[in-house]
Structure formats: C-alpha cells, structure tokens
Amino acid sequence: MSRNKFYDKTIFQIKRMFTDETAISILDNMQAVYEAKDSDYSATGLPMGNLRKCEDAGIEAWRGCLVRIGDKMSRLENFLKEKEYLVISEKAEDTVIDLANYAILMSCLIEEIKPPHSDYYLNLSEKAQESLVNLSYYCVFQAMLWKNNDTENGLVFLEKALSHWKPLCEYSLEMQ
C-alpha cells in the first residue's frame, strides 16, 4: 500500500477489471514503481511531490500531469505510425505502462481539487476521472497483449487508449 490511498483504490478498481494474471502482474509492478518513484521524487513528504512541482510556476499539478500524458501519447502515436522507436532503451510497452500510471496519478490529482467546485465542475471532473481509468485500462490491456505475444489483436487497445486525449483536453479547457 502506498501513502496515496486514492491511487491504491484506483489500482484495485482496475485490477478487478482483469482476470488475466499477466495484467494483474503489470498492475502490481505499476504500483511498486509508483511507490518507489514517489519516495524518490517527493522531497516534501507529500504523495506525488514531483508532480506538484509545477505549482511553483503557477501550473496546477493535474495540468502538469496532463502534459506528461501528452508526451507519452505523442510517443505512442509516432510508434503507431512508424512501428518502432529510435530510442531503443525504452520499449513501447514501457511507454504504455508509464502512460497508465500517469492517468491514475492525474485522476488522484483531480480528486484533490473536486471538493471546492460546483456540481457542474464536479460532474466534469468525474467524467475526466472515468476517462483516465479507461485510458489506464486500455494501456494495461495493450501491455498484457504484448507480454503474452498476442499479435492477433494488433494495436487496437493502444488506439483506444490514445482516443482519450481529446476528452482530457476538453476537460482541461472547460476547467479554465
């Protein structure tokens, strides 16, 4: 268990969507990586301290996380087009797992800002969080297919994951 209870709750929610042991193992690994990195990156003692760093520049942490999600999505969109990476040290599988974790972390950061907002913004936030959980699910599913050497399903789940960029951008624009 991490010090971020909402992260733990969300990982558990996504685990319940899977019966495949490979997917469960990927989610366990994601949680272990998050816990280790959260400890290494969070000098403040707060969960997700590195993601909060952008607040020093007046950028909300969840928006900073959205930028990181955008970086990972750009990399994966290029992978879909080129079918390879020039930087060999990072595989597409690593990128989708990073993306899945960033999606969960952004959902955690949105959870923190929900209470002071109106019902309208609360509804928007819940839709964004649902999109983020689905994004994470599709990323884990794609990683599972790759680990199981399933070539029959191709990259359909990666494409589904990438389809969540537009609604997340719409949420960001609406939350101005």
Give short role names for the model-derived ranges.
Residues 2-176:
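Intrinsically disordered, low-complexity regulatory regions
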